[in-house]
């Protein structure tokens, strides 16, 4: 993996490479990161304020350029600038601690910038709200061009532990799907993104509940082929999505974009400092996601709870096509988790394990070191599988 900070923290290097592989430009990244090289050596937690300041300054510069371009009537240029500004600020916000007073204001600004990007860069993407247990789940819906001619299949794309629907948007996976005639619902499910930050909706083990709400909403749309609704989850979504597909039988296929078969076991390893962590301020973030704020001094009790975030006895109940895509050198989730999910998915009519090697790239966590490569592989598999299901 390209590591901008040779002696810096994994979390920062992962953030840089993820941003570059989601449409970021290397010159802009260099101008943001060069001033904080010394801060990187101070450690991921201590250096986070400097990271935010540097990346926010880059965002401010792009926003000013976008506004100037828009005033001049150069809407394509403005749209590209809004898109990259959204990408950069999303990554900076991801690094912040839950307790950081900058977190919510930064996220709200990110929402505003993303909306500008939709208007000028991605007009087929729109903000939607999914009814869910007396409230709503925020999401972005990409209507594939194929919907101009009738209903199209759709993928529900779900987050992991620390990503947001804005990261999904920046990844351009929805665009790869759209080019193959497939729409995409980028969902901030409970425990992620806007649902967590602004609505206080925390993660739940029974992911089929919110997945069912998404399917209910999609089935009511005239532009959706209700017989071909699939689910794709990256990172911790490699637990969320298979669990949903096992029990929400209206889902027609499932992809674990990074297997997360036994998340509880991974947490116990992290307590012993085995493996890399995805974000600074890790335990504060994890406890927030699961609604266990304030339990920092009761981590053993949380680890007992986390043991239930496990797909043993679950993937056996998946009865639809199931793809597991995993990097051979994933430093967060060991490859053995992918093999466990594959070996136990005995009732899937089409199960496939795709391991990405160092020789080809996309070998790090969810393929962030070569995100377009794994993204297009998954999009091709989804398109092929939906075509098979239509026959």
Predicted regions, residues:
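Catalytic histidine neighborhood in serine/cysteine hydrolases
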Residues: 342-363
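Alpha/beta-hydrolase active-site loop
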Residues: 201-223
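Mobile cap/lid helix-loop segments that gate and shape the active-site cleft of serine hydrolases
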Residues: 271-314
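N-terminal cap/lid segment of alpha/beta-hydrolase-fold proteins
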Residues: 53-55, 59-62, 104-148
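Primarily recognizes the serine-hydrolase "nucleophile elbow" in alpha/beta-hydrolase
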Residues: 90, 217-272
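Catalytic active-site module of serine/aspartate enzymes centered on a nucleophile-bearing elbow/loop
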Residues: 367-391
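Short beta-strand/loop motif that positions the catalytic acidic residue
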Residues: 318-319, 324-326, 330
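Short alpha-helix in the alpha/beta-hydrolase fold that links the catalytic acid
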Residues: 320, 334-344
């Amino acid at each position: 993996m390209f590591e901008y900070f040779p002696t810096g923290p994994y979390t920062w290097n992962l953030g840089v490479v993820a941003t570059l592989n989601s449409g970021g430009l290397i010159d802009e990244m260099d101008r943001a990161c060069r001033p904080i090289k010394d801060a990187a050596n101070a450690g991921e937690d201590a250096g986070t304020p400097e990271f935010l300041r540097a990346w926010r300054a880059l965002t401010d510069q792009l926003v000013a350029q976008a506004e100037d371009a828009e005033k001049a009537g150069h809407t394509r240029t403005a749209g590209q600038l809004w898109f990259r500004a959204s990408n950069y600020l999303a990554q900076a916000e991801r690094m912040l601690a839950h307790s950081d007073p900058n977190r919510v204001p930064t996220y709200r600004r990110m929402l505003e910038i993303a909306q500008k990007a939709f208007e000028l860069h991605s007009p087929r993407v729109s903000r939607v709200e999914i009814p869910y247990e007396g409230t709503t789940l925020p999401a972005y819906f990409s209507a594939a061009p194929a919907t101009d001619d009738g209903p199209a299949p759709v993928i529900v794309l779900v987050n992991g532990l620390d990503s947001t629907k804005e990261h999904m948007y920046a990844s351009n996976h929805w665009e790869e799907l759209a080019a193959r005639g497939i729409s995409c619902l980028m969902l901030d499910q409970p425990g992620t993104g806007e649902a967590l930050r602004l609505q206080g909706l925390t993660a739940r083990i029974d992911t089929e509940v919110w997945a069912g709400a998404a399917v209910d909403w999609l089935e009511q749309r005239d532009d959706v082929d209700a017989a071909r609704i699939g689910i794709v989850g990256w990172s911790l979504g490699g637990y969320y999505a298979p669990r949903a597909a096992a029990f929400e039988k209206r889902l027609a296929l499932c992809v674990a974009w990074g297997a997360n078969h036994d998340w509880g076991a991974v947490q116990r390893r992290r307590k012993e400092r085995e493996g890399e962590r995805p974000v600074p301020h890790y335990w504060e973030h994890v406890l927030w996601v699961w609604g266990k704020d304030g339990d920092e001094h009761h981590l053993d009790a949380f680890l007992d709870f986390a043991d239930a975030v496990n797909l043993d006895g679950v993937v056996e109940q998946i009865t639809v096509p199931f793809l597991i895509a995993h990097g051979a050198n994933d430093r967060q989730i060991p490859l053995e988790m992918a093999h466990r999910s594959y070996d136990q998915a005995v009732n899937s009519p089409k199960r496939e394990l795709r391991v990405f090697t160092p020789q080809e790239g996309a070998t790090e966590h969810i393929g962030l070191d070569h995100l377009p490569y794994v993204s297009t592989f998954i999009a091709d598999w989804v398109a092929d599988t939906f075509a098979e299901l239509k026959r």
